[in-house]
């Protein structure tokens, strides 16, 4: 009589949800497989049947005898026969598409039933289970955002990203078989998303738009809109010395002004201080004490922008050689 007092076995929500999840994945895979098969079958049938029928009609028309006495009637009959054959091929293509659509609708109905069953189990789970156990199961098997919500969020993210093209906001039209033929003849569209690399942040892995056509995503420098992190190759801040020399040569007047300011600061008026550093030449005659004549100082020619040889290196070298030749006794006292 022990079986009479046994408790009723509780419903296993976790196992049932696992089983439904596997069935949902199989149903979704079946839908994707049917759609891809439909596109391949229709494309191959359209191209192959039309090419074979056209070649066969051309061979038959060239080798067949005149059906009517008037040649114009014969041409009209062959053209009408060709059009009738093309129409029959199109009707057969429509029948194939209808059969694939029936399979696709049946698979979608199965997916809809599985989703409804999963929703019922989730509703029962919310009313029976404890809070923490329910929360864990809902996070694992809860319903994901719908397709419409995903499209709205993707559109808002594309508008907020400055690098994304304006063509991505336009509605996507289904690609037909003649679009593929034109892409093979003319070339792919440069603005298409399939021909441009996505900018994925290396830190938070968020989408930051698309790179330009022909440009690699690893060569694009940008700041992530979500984590504000820097992405792309680092910027080389060091400049070569040739660029610095060219910048100095473009403004020689500033160099001459800096030289004058340095000479005024180092040489001050005093009884034992000379006004400017001079080189003492042994061959120069010694002035007598009684004579008060003073030799006029030659005006120093400042650097001008017209002199082609003026550069920062030449000015600094000449200044240091003159300063080094002055005796220590003539240096200004503080």
From Swiss-Prot:
The gene is lnp1. This is Endoplasmic reticulum junction formation protein lunapark. Its main location: endoplasmic reticulum. A zinc finger (C4-type) spans 201-227. GO terms for molecular function: zinc ion binding. It comes from Schizosaccharomyces pombe (strain 972 / ATCC 24843). Belongs to the lunapark family. InterPro entries: Lnp, Lunapark_Znf. Residues 239-252, 273-283 have a biased composition (Polar residues).
